[in-house]
A protein has these predicted regions:
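Short acidic capping loops at alpha-helix termini that bridge into adjacent secondary structure
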Residues: 66-70, 164, 184-185
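N-terminal "arm"/small-domain region of PLP-dependent enzymes with the aminotransferase-like
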Residues: 1-46
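PLP-dependent aminotransferase class I/II
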Residues: 185-262, 266-269
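Active-site phosphate-binding strand-loop segment of PLP-dependent enzymes
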Residues: 114-170
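Short loop-beta-helix segment that forms the pyridoxal 5′-phosphate
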Residues: 48, 60-82
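Glycine/small-residue-rich loop that forms an oxyanion/phosphate-binding "nest" at active or ligand-binding sites
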Residues: 75-85, 162-171, 178-179
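Conserved PLP-anchoring active-site segment centered on the Schiff-base-forming lysine
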Residues: 84-107, 119
Length: 273
């Protein structure tokens, strides 16, 4: 999905007053990050790390997991497409409705697609990969983390891709990598772009078994993550949680908007988690 994702003000050449086409937190203050990157701008005169190892080390330490279970990517989208490429031609099941990049990536790499409208994790006929967005985009639904762990353990023949790009936008408990180091059929996808409200820098990562991480590294291009993005990621991790979204305020504003829209005749606002 190259066009149609949203947040495309560049196409219109004018200031956008209110942009509802993207799910990024709108109240981020990136002033300190901007000043830091200005000081570090000289790094663009050199190639970045072929793999963002320095950032991976910081992430692994912060998460309390082995370094060989983390791979930093050029946004969560690169992670999705790399996974689809690694398992090219496999069968995939994608619950509906959900983020369309899973289907787009699977189609490019010739997956046999099937759909699960009920989001029932127990339904796995002949499918080998189960793609799950949790919290789900666009519905906001959050599946119980204990249920996910149970299903992953009970079905070792299948692979599970759980996209947790929006984990910082919910109060519901979600899976933590430290609790899943024994799950060798699981890939967790994360978005630092959304976590720290920096979508223009494209920064994400995959948590999985060392074997899967190594295989993913073998098919990706070098220098996939640029030097500025790597520096921004390290800065954000050091300053966390100062750089995190104001979740209570964000959710309160979402509720206010929901109530205002619901008051309009002919407008039905669907509930979210």
């Amino acid at each position: 999905m190259i066009f149609g994702h949203g947040d495309d003000a560049y196409r219109y050449g004018e200031q956008i007053t209110a942009d509802f086409s993207s799910n990024i937190y709108f109240g981020a203050d990136l002033t300190d990050l901007q000043a830091y990157l200005a000081e570090r701008f000289g790094i663009v005169g050199h190639y970045p790390e072929p793999e963002a190892v320095s950032l991976e080390k910081m992430l692994a330490k912060k998460l309390g997991v082995p370094e060989d279970m983390i791979m930093v990517t050029n946004g969560a989208t690169e992670a999705i497409y790399l996974i689809a490429q690694l398992y090219s031609g496999w069968a995939s099941i994608i619950p509906q409705p959900t983020f369309t990049e899973y289907e787009d990536a699977c189609r490019i790499y010739k997956h046999l697609l099937s759909y699960n409208a009920d989001n029932n994790l127990e339904v796995l006929p002949e499918d080998r990969i189960y793609w799950l967005c949790n919290p789900n985009n666009p519905t906001g639904n959050v599946l119980n983390k204990h249920l996910i762990r149970h299903i992953v353990h009970e079905n070792p023949r299948y692979l599970y891709v759980v996209d947790q790009s929006y984990e910082d936008y919910t109060l519901s408990p979600v899976i933590h990598p430290q609790d899943m180091t024994d799950c060798y059929n699981l890939m967790l996808v994360y978005s630092l772009s959304k976590k720290y409200c920096i979508p223009g820098l494209r920064l994400g990562y995959i948590f999985s078994s060392p074997i899967i991480i190594d295989r993913l590294r073998q098919i990706r291009q070098p220098w996939a993550v640029n030097a500025i993005a790597i520096e921004a990621g390290k800065y954000m991790l050091e300053k966390d949680p100062k750089m995190m979204p104001d979740l209570p305020g964000f959710l309160a504003e979402a509720q206010r908007l929901r109530e205002q829209l619901s008051a309009i005749d002919g407008v039905m606002v669907m509930d979210t988690a």
